[in-house]
């Protein structure tokens, strides 16, 4: 198990908070990814625009590279709705992500229920 996966699983149960950046106050998907991958999170972003190009720019600026096949610890950029993007951490048998509907960070078994746009890896 990678360090990113262990870190992600340790955060399961942390409350969801839009633009959240700390386990004490809550996390959103960007805050979770930044914390787990030890990267700076963008400020003033909006994933509800559905702009894949802009999301890709942020991911590259954070030192991540796009990969064809996912492995544990990678980020999955997914599209839960027509104008919405979301980040999830790939773990064995599923994903860890900040789930707004459930109100906390969760581990979700199985493949993504949403279309996967791409996978990103920290180097």
Where are these regions (language model features)?
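Short, hydrophobic secondary-structure boundary micro-motifs
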Residues: 17-20, 44
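...with weaker cross-activation on analogous glycine-rich loops/strands in unrelated enzymes
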Residues: 2, 41-105, 109-110, 122-123
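Non-catalytic ligand/cofactor/substrate-binding and regulatory segments of enzyme domains
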Residues: 1-15, 109-123
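Active-site nucleophilic cysteine motif
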Residues: 20-38
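Short secondary-structure junctions and interdomain/linker hinges
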Residues: 15-18, 66
């Amino acid at each position: 198990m990678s360090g990113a996966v262990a870190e992600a699983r340790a955060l399961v149960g942390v409350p969801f908070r839009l633009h959240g950046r700390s386990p004490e106050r809550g996390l959103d998907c960007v805050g979770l990814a930044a914390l787990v991958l030890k990267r700076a999170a963008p400020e003033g972003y909006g994933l509800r625009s559905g702009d894949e190009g802009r999301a890709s720019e942020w991911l590259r600026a954070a030192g991540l590279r796009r990969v064809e096949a996912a492995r544990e610890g990678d980020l999955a950029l997914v599209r839960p709705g027509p104008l919405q993007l979301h980040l999830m951490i790939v773990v064995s048998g599923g994903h860890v992500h900040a789930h707004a509907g459930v109100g906390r960070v969760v581990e979700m078994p199985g493949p993504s229920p949403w279309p996967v746009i791409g996978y990103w890896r920290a180097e």
